[in-house]
């Protein structure tokens, strides 16, 4: 079993998907959920699954480095970090401690639509395909090596919420498969 941490900031659908995925059950040990938002509903999901939760509000720290050092002290035995809707940019200092061991899932076909509100921006641009990317995290926001992508043709009879749900379905299928590949190839 490989010790991992999952970082999330919101509802936690990707966190829950990874934590309950039967194919990952014998491969990863989720040592903790790291959450930067004390009001995030992902915290409740972690409690239901008896997964230790580290709630770290950045507002309680003097600097980003102090915030990240505190997290690092609490996850020192972890081998990989999987970001699942974590809405913070990770500093070069933190990245240096987990070089090549932090993976993110992003709701766009990178390199298109980096950053926030990717689905909405792609939808408003009336793109033919919307998709997801799973990538290693580096110093450039959503700029790391792409590990996997998937997409679907957009039906503009659907609402933005319906398209967003389809994106989440892709995420829930592809993220576990990609994690398995990463961990079994290394």
Where are these regions (language model features)?
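Short, surface-exposed acidic-centric catalytic microdomains
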Residues: 26-70
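Alpha-helical structural signal in soluble globular domains
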Residues: 17-24, 45, 49, 74, ...
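Helix-adjacent hinge/juxtasegments
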Residues: 54, 62-105, 110
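N-terminal Rossmann-like dinucleotide-binding module
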Residues: 1-41, 45
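Short alpha-helical
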Residues: 13, 40-41, 62, 88-89, ...
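Active-site-adjacent beta-strand anchor residues
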Residues: 7-8, 35-36, 83-84, 88, ...
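Donor/substrate-binding cores of folate-linked one-carbon enzymes
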Residues: 21, 87-186
């Amino acid at each position: 079993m490989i010790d991992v941490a999952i970082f999330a900031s919101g509802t936690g659908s990707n966190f829950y998907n990874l934590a309950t995925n039967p194919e990952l059950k014998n491969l990863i040990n989720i040592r903790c959920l790291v959450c930067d938002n004390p009001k995030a509903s992902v915290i409740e999901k972690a409690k239901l699954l008896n997964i230790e939760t580290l709630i770290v509000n950045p507002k309680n720290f003097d600097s980003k480095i102090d915030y990240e050092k505190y997290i690092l002290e609490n996850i020192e035995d972890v081998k990989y970090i999987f970001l699942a809707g974590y809405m913070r940019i990770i500093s070069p200092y933190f990245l240096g401690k987990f070089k090549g061991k932090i993976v993110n899932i992003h709701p766009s076909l990178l390199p298109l639509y980096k950053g926030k509100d990717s689905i909405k921006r792609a939808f408003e641009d009336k793109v033919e395909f919307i998709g997801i990317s799973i990538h290693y995290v580096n110093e450039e926001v959503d700029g790391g090596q792409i590990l996997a992508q998937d997409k679907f043709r957009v039906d503009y009879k659907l609402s933005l919420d319906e398209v967003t749900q389809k994106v989440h379905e892709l995420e829930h299928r592809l993220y576990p498969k990609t994690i398995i590949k990463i961990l079994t190839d290394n």
